[in-house]
């Protein structure tokens, strides 16, 4: 992490935690709330923005529509119906999902609404067939304690998850409807978080509390964190889709670096006398003829297919376009993002990176001359694509540069795997939300309150104390269990194997062994709970050694469909009898007799290393250690060195 004084720059972060609920049915129909890979029907739609009741068009919706996309929907036969296809009105809201949200609200001390009113939130990126997402506030206010700080909760909302994107080609985007309508709970905090580390701790605390309800899904894609980040003098930036908890601090740090860099660029532009009026008067120039003989593969490909190369002068911006604003991303990358999304092009080429990409110094001079620029102070950007796309993209570049005069634009960005972000769309306006007229309000009655009561999660501190008392877990191991997404499974297995397997081994299998495998890149999520339980059954019954468990999980993750028994046979992990272990250790000790006599008791490490190399996964390490120690003692005693 960098040494930024986050307090001095006025960092404020708000979190929105989105978590799928583990309900039997979807939020507005009776389809199962799970993913399905069965056969599917297909249909195609094109979505268009409409005016709100106040006559306004949401800018984010307009932005998506301008892409001219067509959407192909896969409708799995057992996991979607006419509601997902938007051919039938939604059913009444799922009371089970509302009860879970009420339970969470009680745990956070939030004020639960008297009636749940469903709203429509405009979304026309294709992820909702209707062109909007249904969402409903269940509670307001409350707080969660993180360390010594009470972090205020603003809203607790339930909403339907979006369709699952499975492919994209040209104008066509393919979505699968099994995920559309799965209930989500959204918990939004006030923007009072003041450091990247604190944001991670708050997200961890909320996630832990949700898991303790026993009513949330787990696995890849079931939880997502959105961040609202701002600094003094900057702007509120919404960052969507942070999938991993450990990525939160890096995403925030990089966003702070980006905003600080954009503020520096603003000051540089003002010092150089760049004005919005000047940028508005810049006209895109067709430089296709100047580059007709270019050796650039990008340019040649576009020109040969009837496209154009459009250049725009960026007055007094030499050296600024190539400035790094966060690791691996430059101001030119920001311009390219705008060009891609508003113009539908692949990207841009700018003068701060030229000569290069097959474009020569002579060609650079000709472009400067064509746009009326001074190579000593000005910059330019090139866009190569279909004429209409290239012109739109060039104007988007100019608009983004003009926005840089104000500093940091308000926008929505997408989180990337390395912690950086890219421009996603403009910030949505107030015209985005309007009432849902097809669903009657739901009164929070005694029935819902009674459904919620047993789901109210205990404080994590109370749960940790009970785990330590009942199962003898260490404080650290107890907290690791509570924070593990398999919490409910672990607790049930701690009880199942009471008196058969040590609780520390059972808990460690999940929070140490499985996490270690995940750290190695093993896709542990592919191994379902029943198989993990079967592995522990075989350990408890003495059929396999404890050390074999990790190898089995690794094999089964890489070979979905295999049974545990097949994996044991394939890997040769059937546990050896004590007599077989004794025989193998005897062979090793016999071959090292002289070394044992020379080293004495210090030979244990050498013999154990050789023994475990032969026996790993087929015999418990404790048994091997006991036999090795005894065999060495026997040799030393027989030689009179004991």
Curated annotation (Swiss-Prot):
EC annotation from Swiss-Prot or TrEMBL: 6.3.5.-
Keyword Acetylation found: no
Substrates-to-products reaction catalysed: L-glutamyl-tRNA(Gln) + L-glutamine + ATP + H2O = L-glutaminyl-tRNA(Gln) + L-glutamate + ADP + phosphate + H(+)
Disulfide bonds: none
InterPro entries in the cross-refs: Asn/Gln-tRNA_amidoTrfase_suB/E, Asn/Gln-tRNA_Trfase_suB/E_cat, Asn/Gln_amidotransferase, Asn/Gln_tRNA_amidoTrase-B-like, GAD-like_sf, GAD_dom, GatB_C_1, GatB_Yqey_C_2
Keyword Ligase: yes
Record family assignment: Belongs to the GatB/GatE family. GatE subfamily.
Function recorded in the entry: Allows the formation of correctly charged Gln-tRNA(Gln) through the transamidation of misacylated Glu-tRNA(Gln) in organisms which lack glutaminyl-tRNA synthetase. The reaction takes place in the presence of glutamine and ATP through an activated gamma-phospho-Glu-tRNA(Gln). The GatDE system is specific for glutamate and does not act on aspartate.
Protein name in the entry: Glutamyl-tRNA(Gln) amidotransferase subunit E
Organism phylogeny: Archaea, Thermoproteota, Thermoprotei, Desulfurococcales, Desulfurococcaceae
């Amino acid at each position: 992490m960098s040494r930024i004084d986050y307090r001095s720059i006025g960092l404020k972060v708000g979190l929105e935690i989105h978590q799928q609920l583990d309900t039997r049915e979807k939020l507005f129909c009776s389809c199962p709330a799970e993913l399905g890979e069965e056969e599917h029907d297909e249909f195609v739609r094109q979505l268009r923005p409409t005016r709100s009741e106040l006559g306004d068009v949401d800018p984010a919706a307009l932005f998506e529509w301008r892409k001219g996309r067509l959407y192909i929907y896969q409708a799995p036969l057992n996991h979607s119906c006419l509601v997902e296809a938007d051919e039938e009105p939604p059913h009444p809201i799922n009371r089970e999902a509302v009860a879970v949200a009420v339970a969470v609200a009680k745990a956070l001390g939030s004020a639960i609404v008297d009636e749940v009113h469903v709203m429509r939130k405009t979304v026309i990126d294709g992820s909702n067939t209707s062109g909007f997402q249904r969402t409903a506030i269940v509670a307001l206010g409350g707080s969660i304690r993180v360390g010594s700080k009470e972090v205020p909760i603003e809203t607790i909302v339930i909403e339907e998850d979006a369709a699952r994107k499975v492919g994209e080609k040209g104008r066509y985007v393919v979505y699968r409807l099994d995920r559309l309508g799965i209930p989500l709970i959204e918990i939004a905090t006030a923007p009072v978080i003041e450091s990247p580390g604190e944001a991670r701790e708050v997200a961890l605390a909320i996630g832990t509390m949700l898991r303790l309800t026993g009513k949330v899904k787990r696995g890849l894609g079931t939880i997502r964190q959105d961040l609202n980040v701002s600094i003094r003098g900057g702007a509120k930036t919404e960052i969507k889709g942070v999938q991993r908890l450990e990525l939160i601090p890096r995403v925030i740090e990089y966003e702070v670096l980006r905003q600080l860099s954009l503020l520096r660029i603003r000051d540089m532009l003002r010092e150089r006398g760049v004005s919005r009026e000047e940028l508005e008067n810049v006209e895109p120039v067709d430089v296709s003829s100047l580059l007709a003989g270019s050796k650039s593969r990008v340019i040649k490909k576009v020109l040969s297919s009837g496209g154009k190369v459009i250049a725009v002068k960026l007055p007094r911006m030499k050296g600024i376009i190539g400035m790094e604003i966060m690791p691996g991303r430059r101001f030119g990358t920001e311009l390219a993002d705008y060009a891609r999304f508003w113009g539908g092009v692949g990207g841009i080429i700018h003068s701060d990176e030229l000569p290069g990409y097959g474009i020569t110094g002579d060609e650079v001079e000709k472009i400067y001359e064509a746009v009326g620029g001074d190579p000593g102070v000005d910059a330019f950007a090139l866009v190569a694509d279909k004429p209409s796309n290239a012109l739109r993209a060039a104007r988007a570049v100019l608009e983004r540069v003009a926005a840089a005069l104000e500093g940091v634009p308000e926008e929505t960005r997408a989180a990337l795997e390395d912690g950086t972000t890219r421009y996603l769309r403009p910030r949505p306006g107030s015209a985005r939300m309007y009432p849902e007229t097809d669903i009657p309000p739901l009164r929070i009655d005694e029935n819902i309150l009674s459904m919620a009561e047993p789901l109210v999660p205990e404080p994590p501190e109370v749960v940790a104390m009970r785990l330590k008392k009942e199962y003898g877990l260490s404080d650290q191991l107890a907290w690791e269990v509570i924070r593990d997404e398999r919490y409910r499974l672990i607790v049930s297995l701690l009880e199942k194997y009471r008196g058969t397997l040590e609780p520390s081994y059972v808990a460690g299998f999940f929070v140490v062994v499985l996490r270690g495998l995940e750290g190695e890149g093993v896709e542990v999520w592919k191994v379902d709970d029943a198989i993990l339980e079967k592995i522990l059954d075989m350990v408890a019954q003495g059929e396999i050694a404890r050390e074999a468990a990790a190898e089995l999980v690794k094999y089964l993750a890489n070979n979905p469909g295999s049974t545990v028994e097949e994996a044991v046979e394939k890997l040769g992990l059937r546990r050896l009898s004590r007599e077989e272990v004794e025989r193998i250790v005897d062979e090793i000790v016999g071959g090292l007799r002289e070394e044992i006599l020379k080293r004495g008791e210090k030979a244990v490490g050498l013999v154990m290393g050789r023994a475990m190399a032969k026996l790993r996964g087929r015999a418990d390490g404790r048994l091997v250690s006991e036999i090795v120690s005894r065999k060495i003692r026997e040799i030393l005693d027989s030689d009179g060195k004991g």
